[in-house]
Amino acid sequence: MILFQSVGEGYGKRIYEGIRERSSDREVYYIDGDTDPDKRDIFTKRMEEGVNKVMVASFGTMSTGISVKNIHNIFLTESYKSEVLIKQSLGRGMRLYDGKEKVNIIDFVDDFSWEGKDNYLMKHSKERIEIYKKEQFEYKIYEIKI
């Protein structure tokens, strides 16, 4: 599951289209506030029933009341720092069942710090790390230079 926050600028749609273009062997679903509730239910049931599926969804549509046990990886693609939102997002993948022992959370951070000063993306990232520590989640930090 790939979660995004900015629904107004087409950010999630671009992620969805990029994955669909590169993943012809996978079913890829897109859910935002404009997605019909019946369609949302169909997509979440399909996620639950199969493997090798990808859901790109806005935080707002997946934050509460959704239960999909068959989520093994969650990608957080935008910077935010709300502890409630973070816990709700991580909770999407924490529903265990026979054969599932963990969920991988991939938390993307763009470092636009300048002249030794953290920008808000890095500040939010540091706050999320503190939440991960407080909740005793195992985590690793990887720096990828591009």
Regions flagged by a language model, labelled:
Residues 24-27, 69-73, 98-105, 135-137:
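Short glycine-/polar-rich loops that comprise or flank the Walker A/P-loop
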Residues 129, 134-146:
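Charged phosphate-binding loop/patch that engages nucleotide di/tri-phosphates or the phosphate backbone
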Residues 92-128:
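Conserved segment of the helicase C-terminal RecA-like domain
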Residues 56-57, 64-79, 87-88, 102-107:
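A short beta-strand element within the Helicase C-terminal
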Residues 1-7, 31-32:
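Conserved RecA-like ASCE P-loop NTPase motor core of nucleic-acid helicases/translocases
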Residues 33-36, 78-83:
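Short, acidic/turn-prone active-site loops that include or flank metal/cofactor-
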Residues 10-63:
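Conserved helicase ATPase core of P-loop NTP-dependent helicases/translocases
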Residues 7-10, 61-63, 79-82, 94-95, ...:
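Conserved nucleotide-binding/hydrolysis micro-motifs of P-loop NTPases
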